[in-house]
Amino acid sequence: MHPTIKFILASLIILPAIAAADGLAAVADLKGCTNAAITGTAKLKEQVTPEGVKEVTVELKMKGLPDGKHAVHIHEVGACEPCSAAGGHHDPGPAGQSRPDSAMDTMPATDINHPFHMGDLINLDVKNGVGTFKHTTNRVTLAPGRLSLFDADGSAIVVHTQPDTYCDEESELKKGCAGGTREACGVIRLVK
C-alpha cells in the first residue's frame, strides 16, 4: 500500500480519538473550609497538543482569602465536607505517593513525594482579597485514563493557607512545605 494512503488511513483512526478528548471541561465551586466568606470557581478545560499530548488548563478565581501566596493542589478524592475528606494530593500510578509511609510517618501525607504529585499546581497570589491564575498542566486529564481526575472517587481542588515552597529546602522535606492547612475546597465536576 502506498505510504500516503497508509498515512491517511491512520489519520482517520487516530484523529477522531484525539478530537474526542479535546474540549472536555470541568468546574469546581470552592468554599471556605471554616470561613464562609471565602468563595471561588475553578474552570478546567482539556485540549490536545499537535503532538497528541493531553493538557488541562486550570483557571482559578478566589475571593475572601488573606493577601499573599496560597498553595493550590488537586486532591485525590472528590469530597470537601469536611475539607480533610479530599484526601492527599492527586498522584496516581505505580510511583504515586499521596500517603505517608512508615519511614516518613512524621510527615503529613501531602508532603511525601512533593512537588512531584500529578496534582501539584502553582501558587495563587492574592491581593486585596482576590486571586486569579491560569495554569496549564500535562500531569492530569479529564478524559479517562491513568491520570484522569474522574476515577472512582473523583477529585477536588484545594487552596491552602500558606504558599507551596515545593519542599525544596536543600533537598530536605520540612513539615508544611506543601502549603499548610486547607483554606478552601471544591469538588471537580465534569460539565462537557
What are these regions (language model features)?
Residues 18-69, 74-192:
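N-terminal leader/targeting pre-sequences
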Residues 8-16:
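Bacterial N-terminal signal peptides
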Residues 1-8:
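Bacterial N-terminal signal peptides that target proteins for export
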